[in-house]
Amino acid sequence: MLILTRRVGETLMIGDEVSVTVLGVKGNQVRIGVDAPKDIAVHREEIYQRIQHERTVQSQMQHLEQGSFAPSFDDEDYFNR
């Protein structure tokens, strides 16, 4: 992890297209501005985690609807034990 120190008004660059600027500091909160192309998603971590969770649930539901989680054993063999 790269650790940087920036003052209000200073900017750091991520690649050629993303800039992060410190807008203000108030108590233990830091306001930052992110300037990135529209095709690059920028989320707070808790929002990103919720999106990932929702995608996982949605994917699992699609697999269930398609029968992907059906038992892999032969029904006749299973019930004739």
From Swiss-Prot:
A GO CC term assigned to this protein in UniProt: cytosol
Gene3D superfamilies: Translational regulator CsrA (2.60.40.4380)
Cellular localization per UniProt: Cytoplasm
A Pfam short name: CsrA
Keyword Lyase: no
InterPro entries: CsrA, CsrA_sf
Any one biological process term the GO annotation gives: negative regulation of translational initiation
Molecular functions per Gene Ontology: mRNA 5'-UTR binding
Record region (Disordered): 60-81
Keyword terms: Activator, Cytoplasm, Repressor, RNA-binding, Translation regulation
Disulfide partners: none
Assembly with partners or alone: Homodimer; the beta-strands of each monomer intercalate to form a hydrophobic core, while the alpha-helices form wings that extend away from the core.
Function recorded in the entry: A key translational regulator that binds mRNA to regulate translation initiation and/or mRNA stability. Mediates global changes in gene expression, shifting from rapid growth to stress survival by linking envelope stress, the stringent response and the catabolite repression systems. Usually binds in the 5'-UTR; binding at or near the Shine-Dalgarno sequence prevents ribosome-binding, repressing translation, binding elsewhere in the 5'-UTR can activate translation and/or stabilize the mRNA. Its function is antagonized by small RNA(s).
Family assignment from sequence similarity: Belongs to the CsrA/RsmA family.
NCBIfam families: csrA, PRK01712.1
Protein's recorded name: Translational regulator CsrA
Protein species of origin: Psychrobacter cryohalolentis (strain ATCC BAA-1226 / DSM 17306 / VKM B-2378 / K5)
